[in-house]
Design a protein with these regions (language model features):
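Membrane-embedded alpha-helical segments that form the functional core of polytopic membrane enzymes
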Residues: 1-38, 66-75, 135-136, 193
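Short juxtamembrane and helix-loop transition motifs at transmembrane-helix boundaries
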Residues: 1-7, 27-36, 58-66, 88-91, ...
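"…together with the soluble PPM/PP2C metallo-phosphatase catalytic core" -> "…together
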Residues: 1-5, 10, 61-93, 98-100, ...
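Helix-coil boundary and interhelical linker segments in multi-pass alpha-helical membrane proteins
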Residues: 1-10, 46, 50-71, 109-131, ...
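Alpha-helical transmembrane segments of polytopic integral membrane proteins
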Residues: 14, 52, 76-79, 83, ...
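C-terminal ends of transmembrane helices
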Residues: 22-33, 78-93, 97, 144-153, ...
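C-terminal membrane-associated helical module and adjoining short loops/tails
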Residues: 96-216
Length: 216
């Protein structure tokens, strides 16, 4: 991974694509099993726990001391998040806490952008000993939080609530606006991914602050 965070990010995206469709494929093939569920969690841990924590760790500087190791906590909290998801019966239609793929995409896209645009604004933020450790801690807290977050996967059978419909529409609008901005400004493609998943977090946080207005 040294010198090629872009390759690591592409592989992470491939993992996210497979993760998106694996449940659907299992249902269509009638191949669901307990072993498959555990292997799915193991694959998620590697792709969306270990890999993003190492990518964010590599953005740090040895001179930061103990702060430079804070990004490695993402792997630990991702494991807790996956274990919680497997045991929590409340998370069939959506999530409680930030899903590991979303956390991973933020880490991966940031690492890829800093690598391709060393003189950019985000690169200057990442050069100091504050931004990366704080980002890592925020992601760790969100991973194990109880904040309701909508799922991007299809299926489930139950009708979506007004809150979920609002969040999906807001997410699509923010993503479209972010993509348009990236294209017009001719920015690195990884910024589009970073904007989308930052928007995913912000939409869910905003809706959590307005439970009465958005309740079904």
């Amino acid at each position: 991974m040294d010198g090629r965070p872009d390759l690591g990010f592409v592989l992470m995206i491939c993992g996210a694509v497979f993760d998106f469709f694996d449940g659907l494929a299992a249902r269509l093939l009638k191949a669901s099993s307990g072993i498959g569920k555990e292997l799915d969690s193991l694959a998620d841990m590697v792709s969306f726990g270990v890999l993003p924590s190492l990518m964010l760790f590599k953005l740090g500087n040895p001179s930061w001391g103990v702060l430079g190791y804070v990004p490695l906590l993402i792997a630990v909290f991702s494991a807790l998040r996956l274990a919680k998801f497997n045991l929590d019966e409340r998370q069939h239609q959506g999530f409680l806490g930030l899903p590991t793929p979303a956390s991973a995409m933020i880490c991966g896209s940031l690492s890829c952008h800093v690598h391709s645009t060393p003189g950019g604004l985000l690169s200057s933020w990442c050069a100091g000993p504050v931004f990366i450790p704080v980002l890592a801690l925020v992601l760790c807290v969100l991973l194990v939080s109880e904040i309701p977050m909508f799922s991007m996967k299809f299926g489930g059978g139950n009708k979506a609530s007004k809150a979920d419909i609002f969040k999906r529409i807001a997410f699509l609008v923010l993503s479209a606006a972010g993509l348009a901005f990236v294209l017009l400004a001719r920015l690195d493609w990884s910024i589009a991914v970073l904007i989308c998943f930052t928007g995913y977090i912000l939409v869910n946080l905003f809706s959590a602050l307005l439970p009465t207005a958005l309740s079904s």
